[in-house]
Amino acid sequence: MTVRVAVAGASGYAGGELLRLLLSHPEVEIGALTAGGNAGSELGAHHPNLLPLADRVLADTTTAQLSGHDVVFLALPHGHSAAIAAELGDDTVVIDCGADHRLNDPTDWARWYGGEHPGTWPYGIPELPGLRERLTGARRVAVPGCFPTVSSLTIAPALAAGLVDPEVVVVAVTGTSGAGRALKPHLLSAEVMGSASVYGVGGAHRHTPELIQNLSAAGGEPVRVSFTPVLAPMARGILATCSAALRADTDAEAVRKVYLDAYGDEPFVHVLPEGTWPQTSATLGANTVHLQVTVDDDAGRLVAVGAVDNLTKGTAGAAVQCMNLALGLPETTGLPLVGVAP
């Protein structure tokens, strides 16, 4: 089986990570590579690590360039994917790495992104209950945001098992690549190095409604979420600490069993040995989530911690995982399980 693939937004971080993974995928042939303002330049000017594709010239992102492929990945800013996807036929699998098709509620879309709701596609966290079945054979897929990916997988089992109250606190430390490649003063090395800072405080981050949507589905009831992202001086990775009040006396061993039961058969989600806590460095370049969970007896709260590479399992790896499901390939095909360390 040979799958011809196009990547729109190939000059960005997500597009580059997609291409890194696709180069190692045994069933993929890489076709059109497109970009916006960087059209006309060679890919190697943006991703010198991608030597096999370095001399490929980036085309304009148009339907004509993207048509005729089996799979099209859209690694574009929010608001740009829907119009392009609408012009691609159902014979093409379209996988959107942006936000356009993640949210179910048009009101949420209008509040957080503005404009008309582009519609909802099957949502790309196969490890959450019921989602793998929707992704199998899908022709359209919405890749989740990086924060909702790790945070949802970190706390969802506790909500699904009824262990905790439906009020969750999430504090997630992230690297700078999550903000994309565009030049921003607060991401300059002089501003970031040697410092950590919060942003999107007080429920202001756009991933908040997506996280609420996921956790409410997992818990079977509305869940309130207080989400605070923290920018750290590292290029990639997210470490999410999620906590919620326990509904009854429960010890760490019982909680751990819930997580092991939830993820015991999942190839990409690893509940670490007892006493070992996740660290972002162990997930770099891998399509994996590392988890640990315990109980704070004095506070009466469950505390769960998850680590992920925001560019791999947090974006591009999830996109390839969903492509595999959509095409009926083994889910792990072409996806690394081993991170890069140190």
From Swiss-Prot:
Instruction: Give the gene that encodes this protein.
Output: argC
Provide the catalytic activity annotation: N-acetyl-L-glutamate 5-semialdehyde + phosphate + NADP(+) = N-acetyl-L-glutamyl 5-phosphate + NADPH + H(+)
EC annotation from Swiss-Prot or TrEMBL: 1.2.1.38
Write out the GO MF terms. Answer: N-acetyl-gamma-glutamyl-phosphate reductase activity; NAD binding; NADP+ binding
Q: What is this protein called?
A: N-acetyl-gamma-glutamyl-phosphate reductase
Q: Gene3D superfamilies recorded for this chain?
A: Dihydrodipicolinate Reductase, domain 2 (3.30.360.10), NAD(P)-binding Rossmann-like Domain (3.40.50.720)
Highest taxon, organism lineage:
Bacteria
Pfam families documented for this protein:
Semialdhyde_dh, Semialdhyde_dhC_1
